[in-house]
Amino acid sequence: MSHVLAAVAWPYANGPRHIGHVSGFGVPSDVFARYMRMTGHDVLMVSGTDEHGTPIQVQADAEGVTPRELADRYNRVIVADLHGLGLSYDLFTRTTTRNHYAVVQELFEGMYRNGYIVPKTTMGAISPSTGRTLPDRYIEGTCPICGYESARGDQCDSCGNQLDPIDLRNPKSKINGETPEFIETEHFFLDLPALAGVLRQWLDTREGWRPNVLRFSKNLLDDLQPRAITRDLEWGVPIPLEGWRDRGDKRIYVWFDAVIGYLSASIEWARRSGDPEAWRRWWSADGQGKDAPGYYFMGKDNIVFHSVIWPALLAGYSGEGSRDGQPGELGRMNLPTEVVSSEFLTMEGRKFSSSRRVVIYVRDFLERYDADALRYFIAVAGPESNDTDFTWAEFLRRNNDELVAGWGNLVNRSISMAAKNFGAIPPVDPAGLTEADEALLAVARAGFGAVGELIGRHRQKQAIGEAMKVVAEANRYLSEQAPWKLKSEADRPRMGTILHVALQVVSDANTLLTPFLPHSAQKIHELLGGTGVHAPMPVVEEVEDLDGGPAYPVLTGDYSVGARWESVPLEVGRPLDPPKPVFRKLDPSIVDEELARLAG
């Protein structure tokens, strides 16, 4: 058993999350974490709500509330959404905890001591009409690199390059449309050029990454520039240096503090577990965690922060760049093993947009449909390696033709026939298994290797496809063997054998699909007469801040129980009851209903 870190991108707490968000960071990470636990690994899956930065401050000002009040509101909404989806976080926390502030400031101070954070005078944007600072994200213009006309002041979403507002052509304020003025201001910069060598060495060893992620990351190293990590802002983590700590107008930039959340969440989890040093088993590069792999899950717009910025912070804190230096009190820490990036999900051919009502929020989806229906769609048709379009017609088809008519039908008819004719798991005919019986059982057993290998390589579309092939083979077997035709007493042993084989394959297929469809997996486990926890679920707990701050909700859970990644022989004679359908067949009218909602 090894320790495995599953670090999941932090959803921003300025509103509810839509299904496009969870298709990138949520479901893929949970599938991976559940599979790794089922194979015996000690997984630590962490994340939380990202609660600092300009968008929250601007929105709070517009609503007449404090940034903390706004973050509190949406933190609870997001926690409820992710709980409803069954995402199995060991800890889902937030970036406004005092623990997080302390860890962020420790990394900042350590990098500053090592010379990888340096002060620099730069040009900052202000609003001519109000005199207030204009944050990068609220300035748009033409990208000087690719010509994209809606590039933000911090990043171009078209070419992916990081930018400064002053570099934009024809910059405009997104708040009121005016042209910003640029004035001198002092900030701290991350000296990325001094860390380029160690980053390149590390990326050269990442041969197993998705090609687009690795190629994009290496290209970023060709022209690395120092990057500002503080901002003229009132809402954020204070700068932990003499003369700066008490300044109300300067804060650490949100992208710097958010990626450190993976570490601070791990430390918080350890403190809450009663072993404050336990986090080192997943992080320490010199001790017991030196061989622990770390997998980072996100959408493609966050690649740069995980393949360049975060490794640079870890390397700089450890003193591993061209300036050398000494590790801080947290010690040397592991760089990411793999950055697992998903592409974008669109909706009915358009980009998700709350303002244009091109959106379906997770909470609204879960009010009308089952969580596993969405999880299935994301797994089988999500944006794993290409931008993918969510349409209600395709969602309906996948649900009714595959989930209900394929998997649900196999479960229902196998258990129904066994319950009706035997009332229990039937025995195998003493005469033995036929070639057809053996062949189907072999297909199911082979699925554990095939599906598991694909999940381990983050090929989840192929993985669930292999699992559904087992389902299709079992349905074909039942149709060919036709146990319902074996009505005589002499045929009863053969009927029992067919149904025993079918039920065994249902059990095996259920295990193969458990990482993808945990809610239904638990139900099917119970329909097969199983007891106890098959697919453990997260719980929402209200906790006190460990260092005296306000209380807040977290997602956590006990995932040490549950199924293992193996075929478990069914117990002959275990009672079976007539099953109720596991999946809901959806009426075709939902397509027009949902499209009407989009039209507003």
UniProtKB/Swiss-Prot annotation:
Keywords: Aminoacyl-tRNA synthetase, ATP-binding, Cytoplasm, Ligase, Metal-binding, Nucleotide-binding, Protein biosynthesis, Zinc. Binds 1 zinc ion per subunit. A motif ('KMSKS' region) lies at residues 351-355. A motif ('HIGH' region) lies at residues 11-21. Its EC number is 6.1.1.10. Belongs to the class-I aminoacyl-tRNA synthetase family. MetG type 1 subfamily. This is Methionine--tRNA ligase. It comes from Salinispora arenicola (strain CNS-205).
